[in-house]
């Protein structure tokens, strides 16, 4: 399944995503095109806290201005080259995937959808890295739906 097909699928099955409203609020109060990088970083940190509370997960540490965007599973840290919304959402999704590996949190990435959808993020993938298709599509899905709201 291609990424754009996965995004469209997510729009159908993850309509009740907890991430959409906080992202809408963030987009309304922050200038993501020409805004100050430090203001963007502070906005991402607020979003990080809000999403962590909504999903009831630990708050990942955000470090910016590094060489590569990355999520470190062992420490739960998010590294970003720039404070960008899509990059942050992508890495935050990896954080959710990491926490979902615990049995008691199974289904965390299914956004409250039925149990039938628990495996959707990991089926019919293009990328070999576990969860990469899901993280790319989820970040695009959240932004597209937030822009349309």
Task: For the regions a language model picked out, list residue spans one by one.
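Active-site recognition of the HExxH zinc-binding catalytic motif
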Residues: 86-99
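A metal-dependent hydrolase signature that marks the N-terminal structural subdomain at the beginning
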Residues: 1-74
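Membrane-embedded and juxtamembrane structural elements of multi-pass membrane proteins
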Residues: 67, 72-73, 80, 95, ...
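Short pre-active-site segment immediately N-terminal to the catalytic Zn-binding motif
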Residues: 74-88
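Exposed, low-complexity/repetitive linear segments and helix-based recognition motifs
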Residues: 2-5, 79, 129
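Intrinsic disorder/low-complexity segments enriched in polar/small residues
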Residues: 6-12, 74, 98-101, 133, ...
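Metalloprotease/metallohydrolase-associated module, dominated by Zn2+-dependent proteases
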Residues: 32, 39-46, 51, 57-59, ...
